Amino acid sequence: MHSRGFWKRYCIKTTLTERIRELSDGEVRIEGRRVNELSSRERNVAMSFENYGLYPDFTIYDNIAYPLKIHKESPEKIKEKVMDIAKKLRLTNVLYVKPAALSSGQKQRVSIARALVRNPDVTIMDEPLSHLDARMRSNMRSVIRHLHEKLGLTTVYVTHDQIEAMTMADKILIMNNGERQQVGTPDEVYYYPANVFVAGFIGTPQMNLVPCTIRRAGKETTIVEKGAFEVKTERYADSLDDGKAVIYGFRPHDLEVSREAKDGFFKGTVYVTEPLGETTIVSIKAGDIILKAELEGNVYDLVQDQEIYFGIDDKKAHLFDAATEMRIIPGDE
């Protein structure tokens, strides 16, 4: 069973979920069963959407219970299931009011409850947490993931929020402008991004992506950003031609900062610091570019325009072809 995240905005992700719900061409199989000719209800697919889709004249109890009544479950079983999901989603105190009396966040939770209450074969969730505040969103991520694992649900989860995708998904489908960019586990898309788009989209702070040139001298290969750094690499053997245009990607936490000059480090100046409590984001000006480093703790001794030195961990860095923007696979992978 997999939970999948489709994103980002305007990439026909909702159109894809509609095809799962009601395909007009091709083939869809759910639990090994061809469902093309079946209606949405017969496919046993439940849905929760950003715009709620609640019945305004029904109480919250009846909204949640509706799919169970359609499937002709007994009143006793309906009550048991509704009360159970309402408790999990913190809705027990609003079960006997109508949707107009609820906040947008509560309506969102009712929509989720109605989707999950009947234990469908597939659940489609289209940005179900978009109207919740940060605290409730974090709690609901845990609740949905818990129910997903407990009930063995297959969930197609649409989101533009990478945190939701990374924390909740077993596999992620990343899309841009209607085209698939990468399919993989959270670890795969984070540690082995297929292209520049995925590399820049996954991870906070964003990966440093720097246009560079390859310089070859005998068997020695150097990644050069003129005026900023020259990093020697042995990971790509003879696969890189002299003068090749590449994009060098490395995450902020793989950038080491020193107050003093060190072998293999490059000179820069502090552009700005952003203290976040457990970490501090330091923007470093090197030549004509700005790099971001993520350092542990609050770093109070770095001030704007201060001269510092930085080192790049090449073993954790990535190279992308500047023309295709696809990742170049190193020889040690």
Predicted segments, located by residue:
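Conserved ABC transporter NBD signature motif
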Residues: 26-34
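ABC ATPase nucleotide-binding domain helices that frame the ATP-binding cleft
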Residues: 12-14, 110
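C-terminal boundary and immediately downstream tail of ABC-type ATPase nucleotide-binding domains
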Residues: 192-214, 249, 313
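Conserved coupling/switch loops of ABC nucleotide-binding domains, chiefly the family-specific signature
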Residues: 23-27, 177
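ABC ATPase nucleotide-binding domains
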Residues: 43-46, 50, 54-197
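Walker A (P-loop) phosphate-binding loop of ABC-type ATPase nucleotide-binding domains
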Residues: 2-11
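Helix-to-loop junction immediately C-terminal to a conserved catalytic motif
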Residues: 17-18
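Non-catalytic connector elements of ABC transporters
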Residues: 207, 217-333
